[in-house]
Amino acid sequence: MAKALDGKVVLVTGAGGGIGRDIALMAASEGAAVVVNDLGASLKGTGQTESAAQAVVAEIKAAGGDAIADGGSVTDPEAARAMIEAGVKEFGRIDAVVNNAGILRDGFFHKMTYEDFDAVVKVHLYGAFNTSRAAADYFREQEGGALVHMTSTSGLIGNLAQANYAS
């Protein structure tokens, strides 16, 4: 019996843990080949190791799926392009991008530093743009593709000490 994502290739950012991991595992279980992107950074976005992405790839492969790991930063347009191109090179196409990468740098607005505000906006806003834009040319050439942008209710109703996260 055909699965919903048979033959599709999906990039999931922030897929080394949490919701991103579950999305990557679900996509693979539905037949997609998955590009598992994660820096392996802390929730604050510090540190870096590809082991989180590699662990999810190992889970997918152990379950009979197909996946590759990517440790690039969504904040870097060239790294975003490279993660899309890695999927195309390995699997022949890219069909969907799930922009799930995120960090937290909570702080009361009057105490928040520019660096903390900027770091969150770079991951959440520019990161989603960078990966989506990198995929757009392929989607146009293929005459189709899907962008999924994860968000939080903090952006709709706000939350204490999350001005940067809500933006």
Predicted regions and their residues:
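Residue(s) in the substrate-gating loop at a strand-loop-helix junction
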Residues: 152
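The beta1-alpha1 cofactor-binding region of Rossmann-like NAD(H)/NADP(H)-dependent oxidoreductases
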Residues: 71-85, 114
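Active-site loop immediately N-terminal to the catalytic Tyr-X3-Lys motif
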Residues: 110, 157-166
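Hydrophobic positions on the long internal alpha-helix
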Residues: 83, 98, 131-135, 149
